[in-house]
């Protein structure tokens, strides 16, 4: 059986109250000064502030536009679903190592599914993770199609924004997890000169250097470029593991007039070492070992010669042309090739765990020793994935009487091929590890004893074609969004070992409807219904691939986005159900069967505000009540890794006057409630709170405008905690205190 790469969801029962009161006199981003004109006085009128674009930078931490929820450049308050945007401005405050770290203050998103590991950006959104072993992440509106262990990640330094859309999204994107998706927006060329160099050094021997250059190539701004890159090396938290990353993203824009834009986008990333990607048992983490002690937070159960590497190549473009005031055509296209290679020994629970009931090594131990000897397995894996995606859209703006329409019609196509050449070690393929006196040694990954290991050589192919239509119809203050999509999703799996092929072709219609009411004061209540479908990659006892799971959601919410202030406050109540979930065979076979159901009900609140030029505040609260409502084994239980409560609060203050002028001080806290550690709900992972801090100094005062030096601290008090568990044998230590010094120079 293949080693599971993706952790699954969970529950929690503790209550938290977070009260934030902020009193601020009315402020605006822009200030005006009125001077009574005198004779012969020349009056200069300032140009209006540039309009924020859904595909460009936001001036503050509170983005007002997004295309993730509609595929059109839409104000956030007009989208009938919950959307959170983490801007480059906000990422600069925290300097995250990964995109999932950048989302730490975002509601409805669990980022601790792998603890301190940043190998992948795995997320659980509204209680649901992506099916199987894949992420549900997008870049510039196109899915970063992954398969098995072969998932791409993007470095946050390369991004303009990271956006979370919560709830089913199949009406626009086709097959998808019901919980929602992550869409990242690349940095794009500017016509204004940008020259940035950045240096970082910190905990775990971190050293990183990055650069970001952009400018127009001609006097008229018809041609422009951007070149962003970085190199990073560090030790992972777990002893003996390393992280190395080299990335570069060349981009080029041709804009012959104000109606046409063609931007070439590319991304190349090489990671000789992606860091630690193992797991630990609940004994020694959540619970003490029989000797009363716990494993250290830097414990590594793998072999000394474990390796995990990844290489990513992506090229594509974004094109849009406005024919007139009515019609605009857009097309996004990308070709990607990803390679992943690993030799990994990983833990599989202590010998007393039922998961090791068939281990001969464990059976040979005395009963008193089974609680502190760790069973281990291994995987040798080489994969090559190729993916082509294209999305073509026609936007039409017109009116029918008093109703203004933004009509979007589109067709997208995706083709993926992943060639997997793997070998899995089963029970007794790796020597046991004494957790009282662990000695990590090299492992012979070439041994491949057929008595306890075997090949896994699979060629997976997937295709998806979708046609969709969406109308955003506004009459006075009432906005109705209605959309539908029809998908043809095909998948084929060739087993090179058995010489067999499994195929499945699915056709699915999904739709979304929503109503928003736009009050003049910036308050917008809304209601929506949306659907999703998600094909399975697993095979049943009849040898056929399972039918897709389906999701449906009802959401009621309110958004507050005042016209003249950079403030975005949202709140939502949702009821989300995933049907046709896989569950254990009631007849007792080792195969799963269809027919399960999971329901998640939740409440989310988020506030992002640049209250003044000096003050930023970000706060969120999440309540999720998830439950297996239909299941052979787990009915009534809560999925693993889904805390019932999460909350966060961040604030920073910048001094502009006096001796502290240029200094920024910031601090924040992140609370994650307790969660269940396995689908059987046999144990719980405790709640935890970590505190972050920032000290930054703007070097403009010493003649270096746009440059700064900063000190970022995550987990300020070095709280030791277990981030989550997906089973009794799979738990993850949370990140230790991270101290990073950053120097950013612009010239």
Q: Which stretches of residues belong to each language-model region?
A:
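Outer-membrane beta-barrel translocator/receptor signature
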Residues: 157-160, 171-250, 256-260, 313, ...
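Conserved C-terminal beta-signal and adjacent last beta-strands/turns
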Residues: 16-21, 29, 383, 406-407, ...
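Acidic/polar loop-and-plug regions of large Gram-negative outer-membrane beta-barrel proteins
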Residues: 232-236, 249-322, 337-385, 430-460, ...
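Membrane-embedded beta-barrel scaffold of Gram-negative outer-membrane proteins
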Residues: 320-322, 327-334, 338-346, 525, ...
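Acidic, small-polar-rich N-terminal luminal/periplasmic segments of exported/outer-membrane proteins
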Residues: 3, 39-193, 197, 532, ...
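Gram-negative outer-membrane beta-barrel transporters
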Residues: 477, 575, 594-678
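Face-selective signature of the C-terminal outer-membrane beta-barrel domain
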Residues: 315-337, 376-494
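Structural signature of Gram-negative outer-membrane beta-barrels, strongest in the C-terminal barrel
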Residues: 253-257, 385, 404-416, 458-578
């Amino acid at each position: 059986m293949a080693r599971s790469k993706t952790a699954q969801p969970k529950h929690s029962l503790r209550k938290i109250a977070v009260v934030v009161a902020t009193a601020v006199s009315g402020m605006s981003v822009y200030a005006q000064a009125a001077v009574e004109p005198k004779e012969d006085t020349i009056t200069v009128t300032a140009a209006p502030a540039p309009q924020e674009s859904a595909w460009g930078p936001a001036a503050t931490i509170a983005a007002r536009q997004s295309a993730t929820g509609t595929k059109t450049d839409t104000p956030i308050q007009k989208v009938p679903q919950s959307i959170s945007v983490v801007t480059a401005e906000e990422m600069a405050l925290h300097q995250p190592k990964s995109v999932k770290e950048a989302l730490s203050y975002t509601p409805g998103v669990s980022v601790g599914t792998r603890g301190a590991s940043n190998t992948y950006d795995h997320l659980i959104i509204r209680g649901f993770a992506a099916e199987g072993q894949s992420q549900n992440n997008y870049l510039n509106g196109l899915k970063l199609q992954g398969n098995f262990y072969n998932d791409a990640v993007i470095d946050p330094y390369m991004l303009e924004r990271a956006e979370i859309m919560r709830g089913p999204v199949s009406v626009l994107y086709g097959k998808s997890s019901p919980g929602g998706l992550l869409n990242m927006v690349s940095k794009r060329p500017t016509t204004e000169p940008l020259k940035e160099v950045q240096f970082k050094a910190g905990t775990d021997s971190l050293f990183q250097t990055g650069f970001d250059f952009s400018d127009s190539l001609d006097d008229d701004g018809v041609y422009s470029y951007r070149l962003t890159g970085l190199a990073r090396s560090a030790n992972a938290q777990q002893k003996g593991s390393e992280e190395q990353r080299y990335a570069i993203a060349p981009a080029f824009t041709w804009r012959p007039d104000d109606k046409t834009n063609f931007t070439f986008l590319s991304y190349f990333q090489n990671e000789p070492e992606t860091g630690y990607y193992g797991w630990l048992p609940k004994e020694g983490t959540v619970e003490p070992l029989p000797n009363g002690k716990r494993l250290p937070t830097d414990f590594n159960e793998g072999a000394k010669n474990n390796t995990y590497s990844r290489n990513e190549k992506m090229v594509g473009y974004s094109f849009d042309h406005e024919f007139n005031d009515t019609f605009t055509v857009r097309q996004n296209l990308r070709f990607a090739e990803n390679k992943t290679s690993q030799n990994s020994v990983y833990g599989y629970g202590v010998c007393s765990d039922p998961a090791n009931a068939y281990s001969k090594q464990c059976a040979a131990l005395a009963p008193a020793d089974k609680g502190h000897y760790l069973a281990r397995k291994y995987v040798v894996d080489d994969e090559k994935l190729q993916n082509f995606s294209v999305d073509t859209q026609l936007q039409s703006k017109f009116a029918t009487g008093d109703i203004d329409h933004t009509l979007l019609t589109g067709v997208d196509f995706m083709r993926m091929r992943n060639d997997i050449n793997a070998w899995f070690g089963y029970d007794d393929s790796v020597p046991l590890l004494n957790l009282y006196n662990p000695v990590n040694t090299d492992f012979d990954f070439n041994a491949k004893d057929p008595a306890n290991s075997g090949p896994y050589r699979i060629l997976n192919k997937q295709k998806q074609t979708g046609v969709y239509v969406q109308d955003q119809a506004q009459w006075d203050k009432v906005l109705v969004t209605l959309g539908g999509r029809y998908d043809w999703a095909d998948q084929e799996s060739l087993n090179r070992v058995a010489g067999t092929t499994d195929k499945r072709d699915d056709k699915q219609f999904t739709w979304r409807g929503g109503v928003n009411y736009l009050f003049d004061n910036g308050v917008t209540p809304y209601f929506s219904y949306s659907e999703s479908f998600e094909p399975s990659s697993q095979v049943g006892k009849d040898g056929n691939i399972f039918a897709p799971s389906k999701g449906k959601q009802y959401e009621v919410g309110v958004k507050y986005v005042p016209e003249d202030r950079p403030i975005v406050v949202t709140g939502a109540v949702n009821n989300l159900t995933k049907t046709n979930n896989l569950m254990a065979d009631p007849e007792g076979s080792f195969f799963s069967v269809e027919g399960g159901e999971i329901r998640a009900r939740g409440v989310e609140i988020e506030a992002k505000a640049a209250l003044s030029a000096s003050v930023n505040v970000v706060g969120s609260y999440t309540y999720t009540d998830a439950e297996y409502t239909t299941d052979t084994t787990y009915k009534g239980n809560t999925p693993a890794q889904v805390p019932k409560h999460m909350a966060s609060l961040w604030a920073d203050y910048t001094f502009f006057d006096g001796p502290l002028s240029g200094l920024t001080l910031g601090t924040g806290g992140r609370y994650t409630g307790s969660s269940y550690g396995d689908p059987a709900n046999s144990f719980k992972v405790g709640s935890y709170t970590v505190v972050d801090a920032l000290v930054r100094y703007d070097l403009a005062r010493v003649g270096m405008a746009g440059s700064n030096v900063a000190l970022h601290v995550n987990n300020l008090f070095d709280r030791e905690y277990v981030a989550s568990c997906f089973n009794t044998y799979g738990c993850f230590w949370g990140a230790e205190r991270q101290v990073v010094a950053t120097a950013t120079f612009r010239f």
